[in-house]
């Protein structure tokens, strides 16, 4: 298939919906005629040293099908949606040029939205400004920082909770770097539709008909992560000495709850319950976003033949119904 005829496809779904297994099923089904390379759409998988709590594909799995955008940042570093769009767009072109199909797989809906809809031309992260804001927050607290945000950017402050330190910090950073409120960047998109690498029409989604099915899988997976040494993984990250609870990496679901327990904010015995509850809330937000995308091709991930349905739909999209 000529490179310019190879589509880029996306597979999204809530956490624990079976995206990884489904992606391998797609790769196996297409491999005889069209190799597949996977681009991760996951804001946690970008971080090295965070393997168990992110359900990161194993080295063997990554060797089986080429993976991209995994282990590309240290947990001390930030990785923005704008950086993701830039990296994913480049990779889509490179993978097509190799005669392979780019399959974007994950559950970070902000990244998918930025890829499909375009992204505002906001200023990049500025480490020096961020450090000054963190020092200011240490002095006056995040409620004080929220009040400062309300002074310079009332619309953004109105939609953020006073404890949402990560987003408050980013909004203030944008203000200090650009002189413009974050809310002013939300009015227009700078990337024309014709320049975007793919559209939501290329999106396949895994969505459960029965939420109880997904909740059961979430609980099972969290307990399995704990049994696999997740807490030891968080202890190793803490032992570095340069990480803290307000970093984007340490605010990932599971890591945040483990860090809080290790800080003594909650009993360690409550970690499974709190981790599972936070994961369920994440899944709810992911499903809500997916249902706002009418162009998507939705597959019931709790159906007995979910994988067969997905593979058939992908085949039809790639080859127009050919086998």
Swiss-Prot record:
Keyword Nucleotidyltransferase: no
Protein residues bound to substrate: 15-20
GO biological process: tRNA modification
InterPro entries: Dimethylallyltransferase, IPT, P-loop_NTPase
Site (Interaction with substrate tRNA): 108, 130
UniProt-annotated binding residues for ATP: 13-20
Record-listed E.C. numbers: 2.5.1.75
GO terms of molecular function: ATP binding; tRNA dimethylallyltransferase activity
Cofactor(s) the protein requires to work: Mg(2+)
Catalytic activity: adenosine(37) in tRNA + dimethylallyl diphosphate = N(6)-dimethylallyladenosine(37) in tRNA + diphosphate
Broad enzyme group: transferase
Pfam families: IPPT
Stretch list, region Interaction with substrate tRNA: 42-45, 166-170, 251-256, 284-291
Keywords: ATP-binding, Magnesium, Nucleotide-binding, Transferase, tRNA processing
Subunit structure: Monomer.
HAMAP family on file: IPP_trans
Protein function: Catalyzes the transfer of a dimethylallyl group onto the adenine at position 37 in tRNAs that read codons beginning with uridine, leading to the formation of N6-(dimethylallyl)adenosine (i(6)A).
Family: Belongs to the IPP transferase family.
Protein name stated in the entry: tRNA dimethylallyltransferase
